Amino acid sequence: MKRILKTAGTSNFKEESYYEYLNLDTLESFKELSNVKKVNLVEAMTGENGAERVKKYSVPMAAGLAYNYAAKQVDDDVLEGLKKLAKEAQLTEKYAALYNGEMINTGEKRLVLYQLTRGQLGDTVTADGVDKRAFYVEQQQKIADFANKVHAGEITNAAGEKFTTVVQIGIGGSDLGPRAMYLALENWAKKNDKFKMEARFISNVDPDDAAAVLNSIDVAHSIFVLVSKSGTTLETLTNESFVKDALKNAGLDASKHMIAVTSETSPLAKSDDYLAAFFMDDYIGGRYSSTSAVGGAVLSLAFGPEVFAEFLEGAAEEDKLAKNEDVMQNPAMLDALIGVYERNILGYPSTAVLPYSQALSRFPAHLQQLDMESNGKSVNRFGDPVNYVTGPVIFGEPGTNGQHSFYQLLHQGTDIVPLQFIGYRNNQMGTDVVIQDSTSQ
């Protein structure tokens, strides 16, 4: 069934835009793609042709990264089909609608503004009478000021002693993303004299999780970040209660050890139970919140506001690349389209994300949520059932650990599992061992 969605730009008074939202299996380009000859990857990657393919099938990303898809089961004919699919599906136009502040989340009637936490890609976006980019920057600055005061010893515990540890209390997106980013940067920060405070994370409502963290830290010198957009998240408030009891049992005033990241309308916003409150809003989904105050508070305390600002700059540069109408120069869109091809044409049910870096040990779990929580649907945006699969199962572990566990199935099992390798030229600690011209062994 063909549907056309009319969307207006809320309080920006934009002209109305019209987009066709068609089920994937009804698109002519998708049907054509189904008939394109499948690639024999072994032949394609063998000999001189393989070496040339590795050079050809690579596209630059932001901050010196590169996306190489030579080992993906595509060729020029498949790529041409994917370009047609992107055009027919109006992907570039719909992405522009997102960052220009049109109502993309029609189910909840909300804008989708996570990209504004790291930069302004298009028009000024005003919602609820507020310039949202200015709002997010204001919160980032407030977090930076707070973190700097903590690091300088201007904000201390009751004994006038500096805080040395920060503990984030959250669940889902308020845990997975910030935790992955902290672990990714921890050793780099220590190596480069950027490290300020140890960070720990509590998310599981199983009290063993909180107990293990609390037993590993000095609570008298710890500051706790409670993250709940609504201020009513059961799991998070349960863990907060556990932490407050621990602080009380240690003879400490919990309100002198806790800050909140929440919405301006939540019961936490003006509570005396917190040293400070920093705000997010309903326009940022939890799984995309690492670049908002959700990630900003814990990462700024752990590494300093300057490091968090650099993180935002890198994300903003990648966002800009995602605007490119040329699919072959748009690594984010290209990878997504190849993923659709692998799942919906080739029929591969899962994708493994394999970072050859211990620092990215929790990055696959973060990507797992980003992809599977976003695409885990059985109906389209109009509530009609879909007759095709909507996404793969995402899983992964760092190499080389995975090589000695589930890689056996990847190499010799009967299922074909697409792989996403993440490798680096150098590690964070300067202790590389070069094997076969790569330090990511």
Where are these regions (language model features)?
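Acidic, serine-rich low-complexity intrinsically disordered regions
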Residues: 3, 7-8
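Extended, charge-enriched "interface" segments that sit outside catalytic cores
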Residues: 9-159, 437-440
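General structural feature for long, well-ordered alpha-helical segments within catalytic domains
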Residues: 26-29, 53, 74-82, 94, ...
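Surface-exposed loop/turn and secondary-structure junction residues enriched for glycine/proline
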Residues: 36, 60, 70-72, 77, ...
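Flexible, active-site-adjacent loop/turn segments at secondary-structure boundaries
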Residues: 39, 43, 52-55, 63-67, ...
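Non-catalytic regulatory/linker segments of enzymes
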Residues: 117-129, 133-165, 173, 177, ...
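Glycine-rich phosphate-binding loops that contact phosphosugars or nucleotide phosphates
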Residues: 145-153, 159-325
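Active-site phosphate/pyrophosphate-binding segments
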Residues: 246-437
